[in-house]
Design a protein with these regions (language model features):
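A short acidic, often aromatic-flanked loop/helix-cap motif at beta-alpha or helix-coil junctions
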Residues: 80-86, 106-107, 150-155
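Alpha-helix boundary/interfacial micro-motifs
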Residues: 49, 57, 119, 146-147
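Long, charge-patterned amphipathic alpha-helical coiled-coil/hairpin "stalk" segments used as oligomerization
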Residues: 100-141, 147-148
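Surface-exposed, flexible loop/turn segments at secondary-structure boundaries
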Residues: 4, 44, 106, 132-133, ...
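RNA substrate-binding interface of SAM-dependent RNA methyltransferases
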Residues: 1-103, 167-170, 174
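Conserved strand-to-helix beginnings and helix N-cap segments that scaffold or border functional pockets
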Residues: 49-50, 112, 159
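Structured adenosyl-cofactor binding patch, chiefly the S-adenosyl-L-methionine
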Residues: 132-176
């Protein structure tokens, strides 16, 4: 959620939407992702999401829907990408490869096929943005993933919600 562009091209921190967290945690659980990190520099945004996570994992919601509880246990809140990378490195004993995603094309992109091979060999941190995209120049990354392309060929429209992009990318990486 930071740093991202708003619709006017200004660098901002976008608001965290609770249903993004719930849906993406469910996707993560479905595809065997070890952890879902949500990065936001503002305490109030992290606290709001923490209350939702706690309701479903420790509060009354844990009795209502055990699947949601299990999925939301994957969520980790952080104030910076550096914290996330250090946490993964501590747990995996190796620094993760950081994968930048964007709807825009860029030279030297990694293909889904190549990333699918890397996922088997190395810890991967895939960055998904909100708003009008992540600020490429402010985020250290190892590879940029090719964008999701629509149908039919030549369809330039690809302004997807973060939930949709996550679902498509995880399916492409972990499908049989």
């Amino acid at each position: 959620h930071y740093p991202v562009y708003d619709r006017k091209g200004k660098v901002v921190a976008s608001s965290i939407l609770p249903y993004d967290i719930v849906d993406i945690s469910r996707l993560s659980k479905t595809f065997g992702v070890k952890a879902l990190y949500v990065v936001h520099p503002f305490d109030n945004q992290r606290r709001a999401i923490e209350r939702i996570i706690n309701f479903w994992t420790k509060g009354g919601g844990r009795f209502f829907n055990r699947y949601r509880r299990e999925a939301l246990k994957l969520v980790n809140l952080s104030s910076s990408l550096d914290e996330v990378i250090m946490d993964i490195e501590r747990k995996e004993r190796v620094k993760p490869l950081v994968i930048f995603t964007s709807a825009k094309t860029s030279k030297g992109e990694i293909t889904f096929k190549k990333l699918k091979e890397l996922v088997k060999k190395h810890p991967i941190l895939i960055l998904f943005g909100t708003g009008w995209g992540m600020v490429r120049e402010k985020i250290p990354f190892d590879y940029q993933l090719e964008p999701i392309k629509g149908y039919p060929e030549g369809n330039e429209y690809n302004h997807l919600s973060v939930r949709s992009a996550c679902a498509i990318i995880l399916d492409r990486l972990f499908n049989r």
